[in-house]
Amino acid sequence: SRMSDPKMIKEIIDAVSIPVMAKVRIGHVVEAQILQAIGIDYIDESEVLTPADDLFHINKKEFNVPFVCGARNLGEALRRIGEGACMIRTKGEAGTGNVIEAVRHMRTIQSQIRKLKVMPKEELMIAAKELGAPYDLVEYVRENGKLPVINFAAGGIATPADAALMMQLGCDGVFVGSGIFKSENPAKRAKAIVEAVKNYNNPLKIAEVSEGLGEAMTGLEIDKLDVTFAER
């Protein structure tokens, strides 16, 4: 799959008052140039689309539009940030309604951050080499205990409880697409997920907003998928 029709993207931009994000294929510089030219607010260099380049991601520093990129671990996150990404998200399996991959990626990144925080400074160069990440970004994570950009959860989030779980695991926010639009009552579910993110440490509130939402999207087993996006 490829970038959406620019005409449709422009129609969406004209129809809504909120920022609009659109996907480009990994490594496809021209798709990103097109989106910037038509006035998109954010670009997602996304593994959900068929990659255009299996070696290189886009040099995001050459663009004025902010990019979001996926990451399964700290090394991937810091490499994308080194290329200019302004936001990181998990590479959960989009369209599955199964949150397990997003959970795995967030736990992995948080665990690796905790290890860096207690690492002697003289070991950071080795850690940077093992992570395949820029030394200055590794040093930042050690000193601050977090990524230098915000880290969202994405992929497989289908319920208010899923969203609250990801917030409790340490993410800064969540992306939800098919989990809302493939559910029985998209508008009500969207509002409930927003409330769950705002009140992620309040089980009673999450229980309240989870009532009467109708059927959630059908969940899929990750190990039965022919293709997993996270591997891209």
Curated annotation (Swiss-Prot):
Q: What does this protein do?
A: Catalyzes the formation of pyridoxal 5'-phosphate from ribose 5-phosphate (RBP), glyceraldehyde 3-phosphate (G3P) and ammonia. The ammonia is provided by the PdxT subunit. Can also use ribulose 5-phosphate and dihydroxyacetone phosphate as substrates, resulting from enzyme-catalyzed isomerization of RBP and G3P, respectively.
- One GO molecular-function entry: pyridoxal 5'-phosphate synthase (glutamine hydrolysing) activity
Protein name listed in UniProt: Pyridoxal 5'-phosphate synthase subunit PdxS
Q: Hey, which family's this protein in? A: Belongs to the PdxS/SNZ family.
Q: Which GO terms describe its biological process?
A: amino acid metabolic process; pyridoxal phosphate biosynthetic process; pyridoxine biosynthetic process
Q: What is its EC number?
A: 4.3.3.6
Keywords associated with the record = Lyase, Pyridoxal phosphate, Schiff base
**Disulfide bridges in this chain:** none
Q: What InterPro entries does this protein's entry cite?
A: Aldolase_TIM, PdxS/SNZ, PdxS/SNZ_N, RibuloseP-bd_barrel
Q: Which Pfam families match?
A: SOR_SNZ
Named in its record, the pathway it takes part in is:
Cofactor biosynthesis; pyridoxal 5'-phosphate biosynthesis
> Which organism is this entry from?
Clostridium novyi
Q: According to its UniProt record, which residues of this chain constitute the active site?
A: K23 (schiff-base intermediate with d-ribose 5-phosphate)
Describe, as the record does, how this protein assembles with itself and its partners: In the presence of PdxT, forms a dodecamer of heterodimers.
Known catalysed reaction(s)? aldehydo-D-ribose 5-phosphate + D-glyceraldehyde 3-phosphate + L-glutamine = pyridoxal 5'-phosphate + L-glutamate + phosphate + 3 H2O + H(+)
Binding-site positions, D-glyceraldehyde 3-phosphate: R107
Q: Which residues bind D-ribose 5-phosphate?
A: G95, G156, G177, S178
Matches recorded under SUPFAM superfamilies = Ribulose-phoshate binding barrel
